[in-house]
């Protein structure tokens, strides 16, 4: 496999879509790991009690755009009735601190009274999206950004193929993917009825799935699995499964979630960081750009422990290469930007910029990551001048 970048004679791309190129993503999953046991990351990270301080801390680090989540399960506890007391303080605090938010409407969670497999799920989600958009318009929010459903592909696999979290199903991933696409499209249309100028960041993992050199017969299967990562975006764009209602104008901004372990050999063998088969990020970005010609955001990226600073350096260098090729990368968002007790195994998340809060509500800054962040912010500002 060639790792050489494609020839591109276009001028360097100058990002301008968001308030800041470097951004922060708050942990805001509300998945049920087991039936009846919901893990609310906005709560467990302390973010719900520290909104003002957290947004101010991002502003201090020049992270003026952030991804954060509306907790649908709290807002619509009673079918058709919306209680905004968990959400309005977020809107107000972000406005005071001048932080631009990309709002997630469903991050692996939904109200207990809904059955995700039923048509009513899509209908409720559409009404919720419309109500949320109307609330934000009433609050005077201009040029809003939304993510209707976070990581459709990952949720479909984790929730309906391997039963890792809700809806706790097996071998129904494609069915859930189609349902989540229906819900996303319904939300996009509902929000646009209120906010024609709204923009949508549609997130999913960006991965490389390759055949192992010792197993050349697996190449067609690896290639097929690699291509499957694009299926949800293709559905949203109406390129496949047209009966779902997708269209090209619904595929807006691609949100790419990218981590060190996003490379593996078919079917599930991890690929080491120094494996020669590993395709650099800028090549994966070029492939995505060639396929969709849409603006892209590295919507989540980060590494654990001492690797977090060099990882950001590597990501930034790859994104710089992509920008030089004329590829529309609009930002890099650090995840998690604040620490939380990890939802998969009850560890503390080891990769944040800001640690768990002390009794006074203060979070320690990870100095080496902050230094690399500041260095890259200066470099990218100079490049974009």
Residue ranges and their predicted role:
Residues 2-49, 55, 59-61, 73-385:
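Non-catalytic scaffold segments within catalytic domains of secreted glycoside hydrolases
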Residues 69-71:
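Juxtamembrane transmembrane-helix termini
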């Amino acid at each position: 496999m060639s790792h050489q970048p494609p020839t591109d004679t276009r001028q360097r791309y100058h990002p301008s879509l968001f308030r800041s190129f470097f951004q922060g993503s708050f942990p805001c999953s509300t998945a049920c790991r087991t039936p009846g046991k919901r893990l609310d990351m906005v709560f467990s990270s302390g973010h719900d009690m520290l909104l003002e301080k957290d947004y101010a801390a991002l502003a201090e680090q020049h992270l003026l755009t952030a991804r954060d989540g509306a907790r649908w399960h709290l807002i619509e506890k009673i079918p058709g009735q919306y209680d905004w007391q968990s959400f309005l303080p977020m809107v107000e605090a972000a406005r005071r601190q001048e932080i631009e938010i990309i709002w997630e409407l469903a991050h692996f969670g939904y109200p207990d009274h809904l059955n995700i497999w039923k048509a009513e799920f899509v209908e409720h989600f559409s009404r919720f999206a419309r109500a949320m958009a109307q609330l934000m318009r009433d609050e005077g929010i201009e040029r809003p950004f939304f993510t209707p459903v976070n990581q459709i592909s990952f949720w479909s696999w984790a929730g309906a193929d391997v039963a890792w979290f809700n809806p706790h199903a097996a071998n129904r991933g494609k069915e859930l993917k189609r349902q989540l696409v229906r819900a996303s499209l319904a939300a996009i249309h509902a929000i646009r009825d209120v906010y024609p100028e709204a923009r949508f960041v549609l997130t999913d993992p960006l991965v490389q799935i390759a055949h192992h050199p010792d197993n050349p017969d697996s190449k067609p299967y690896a290639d097929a699995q690699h291509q499957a990562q694009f299926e949800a975006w293709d559905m949203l764009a109406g390129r496949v499964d047209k009966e779902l209602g997708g269209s090209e104008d619904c595929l807006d901004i691609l949100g790419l979630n990218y981590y060190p372990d996003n490379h593996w050999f078919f079917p599930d063998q991890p690929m080491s960081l120094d494996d020669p088969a590993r395709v650099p990020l800028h090549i994966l970005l070029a492939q995505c750009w060639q396929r969709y010609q849409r603006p892209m955001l590295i919507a989540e990226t980060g590494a654990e422990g001492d690797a977090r600073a060099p990882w950001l350096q590597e990501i930034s260098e790859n994104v710089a290469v992509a920008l030089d090729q004329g590829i529309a990368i609009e930002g890099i968002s650090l995840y998690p930007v604040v620490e939380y007790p990890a939802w998969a195994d009850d560890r503390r998340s080891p990769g944040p910029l800001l640690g768990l809060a002390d009794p006074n509500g203060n979070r320690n800054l990870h100095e080496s990551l902050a230094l690399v962040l500041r260095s890259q912010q200066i470099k990218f500002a100079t490049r974009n001048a």
